[in-house]
Amino acid sequence: MELQLAIDLLNKEEAAELAKKVEEYVDIVEIGTPIVINEGLPAVQHLDENISNAKVLADLKIMDAADYEVSQAIKFGADVVTILGVAEDASIKAAVEEAHKHDKQLLVDMIAVQDLEKRAKELDEMGADYIAVHTGYDLQAEGQSPLDSLRTVKSVIKNSKVAVAGGIKPDTIKDIVAEQPDLVIVGGGIANADDPVEAAKQCRDAIEGK
């Protein structure tokens, strides 16, 4: 099981500083969509230049022009790139092909997908490396949790890894870990903690069953 830190609300310098502090506890560090919107792909490059062990994920949430956008993210140092599960099949296939051509990975974000079971099966067959169930900020505010979605997707896929995101914190991560996802994505639960290093350590300990 892997742990990913999602960084959304910092600038690229702050993001790299945070990543360096917690890198020993995380497998992947994500430059979130808001940072990409604010600062562009150089934010991905800046992170890549400042960490040495964790993989770098560029959360582009691609919807179209997939092969080009994946190739650009990789050029700027991304190891994993995201595309939306609601994108056209042609876009998903092009993104998978482009990522794999460079020995990189594609994560498909299931935010706003209505028929999770059907789409997860299709994405699995298309070669997605990760399928991520994602309760976004707007639904978290309504009290939704990604647990049911995680169970649904996990039950139908054969090859892809299952990732889970959405409001996960050190004090709730054990409920998620109990469902055995392949990748747990924590954002504000680490980034906004009074002690981000301790929060990251707690998440890592939970994943390792300590």
From Swiss-Prot:
Catalytic activities: D-ribulose 5-phosphate + formaldehyde = D-arabino-hex-3-ulose 6-phosphate
Pfam families: OMPdecase
InterPro entries xref list: 3-hexulose-6-phosphate_synth, Aldolase_TIM, HPS/KGPDC, OMPdeCOase_dom, RibuloseP-bd_barrel
Protein origin, superkingdom: Bacteria
Pathway: One-carbon metabolism; formaldehyde assimilation via RuMP pathway; D-fructose 6-phosphate from D-ribulose 5-phosphate and formaldehyde: step 1/2
A single MF term (Gene Ontology): orotidine-5'-phosphate decarboxylase activity
Keywords noted in UniProt: Carbohydrate metabolism, Lyase, One-carbon metabolism
Keyword Calcium: no
CDD domains hit by this protein: KGPDC_HPS
Enzyme Commission number: 4.1.2.43
Any one Gene Ontology BP term: formaldehyde assimilation via ribulose monophosphate cycle
Catalytic EC class: lyase
NCBIfam families referenced in this protein's UniProt entry, alphabetically: RuMP_HxlA
Record PANTHER family: 3-KETO-L-GULONATE-6-PHOSPHATE DECARBOXYLASE SGBH-RELATED
Function: Catalyzes the condensation of ribulose 5-phosphate with formaldehyde to form 3-hexulose 6-phosphate.
Record family assignment: Belongs to the HPS/KGPDC family. HPS subfamily.
Protein name: 3-hexulose-6-phosphate synthase
Organism ancestry: Bacteria, Bacillati, Bacillota, Bacilli, Bacillales
